[in-house]
Amino acid sequence: MRIYINEIKLKDDGVYCFSEESTEGLEEVGQMLVDSDNYGFAYLLDDGQSYSYLIFVQETWSMLHENRDKRIIINNHLELKHFQEELDYVLNNIEGNNNYGKEFVSAVEKTFELE
């Protein structure tokens, strides 16, 4: 299942991300994938039987970048403890790597100030 983050609220203690789909019963896997065709980052969640993809589309990237030091909390209950580590890993792989597509790499480098 693809779960799209469609709202982000900043609070003192974290970045609160919300989706229309429920994330109850899901736990983080601690792995992020790249969807360069659709300009998104997909963070893996697991319900014990199957994986779901928590999708952060391009419109969310600047908020993630500007608040890198804050906790990421999904639907007020699920803290993504390995999110920042995984995002950093993915960003390091994307930087200068046109295998992801030149336009995607350029967008990531610009938003996350990798240039």
From Swiss-Prot:
Pfam families: UPF0738 (PF19785). It comes from the Bacteria. InterPro entries: UPF0738 (IPR020908). Belongs to the UPF0738 family. HAMAP family: UPF0738 (MF_01861). This is UPF0738 protein SE_0694. It comes from Staphylococcus epidermidis (strain ATCC 12228 / FDA PCI 1200).
